[in-house]
UniProtKB/Swiss-Prot annotation:
This is Photosystem II reaction center protein H. PSII is composed of 1 copy each of membrane proteins PsbA, PsbB, PsbC, PsbD, PsbE, PsbF, PsbH, PsbI, PsbJ, PsbK, PsbL, PsbM, PsbT, PsbX, PsbY, PsbZ, Psb30/Ycf12, peripheral proteins PsbO, CyanoQ (PsbQ), PsbU, PsbV and a large number of cofactors. It forms dimeric complexes. GO terms for biological process: photosynthesis; protein stabilization. Its main location: membrane. It is found in: Cellular thylakoid membrane. The gene is psbH. It comes from Cyanothece sp. (strain PCC 7425 / ATCC 29141). One of the components of the core complex of photosystem II (PSII), required for its stability and/or assembly. PSII is a light-driven water:plastoquinone oxidoreductase that uses light energy to abstract electrons from H(2)O, generating O(2) and a proton gradient subsequently used for ATP formation. It consists of a core antenna complex that captures photons, and an electron transfer chain that converts photonic excitation into a charge separation. One of its GO terms (molecular function) is phosphate ion binding. Gene3D superfamilies: Photosystem II reaction center protein H.
Amino acid sequence: MAKRTWLGDVLKPLNSEYGKVAPGWGTAPLMAVFMGLFLVFLLIILELYNSTLMLEGVNVNWTALGS
């Protein structure tokens, strides 16, 4: 039999819902929305790095960052 520890006793409530599945889609649509927003964020960063997205007054000089 497994030894009981204080950490196991603290974490047990987090595992009390094991095996139970919410009916339907649950929070999957909300997760998809946040994944889409994260994708847009990454695309904006990529375009800034690639200099394909130009912002007025923002000078991106990557060589200056290295020195």
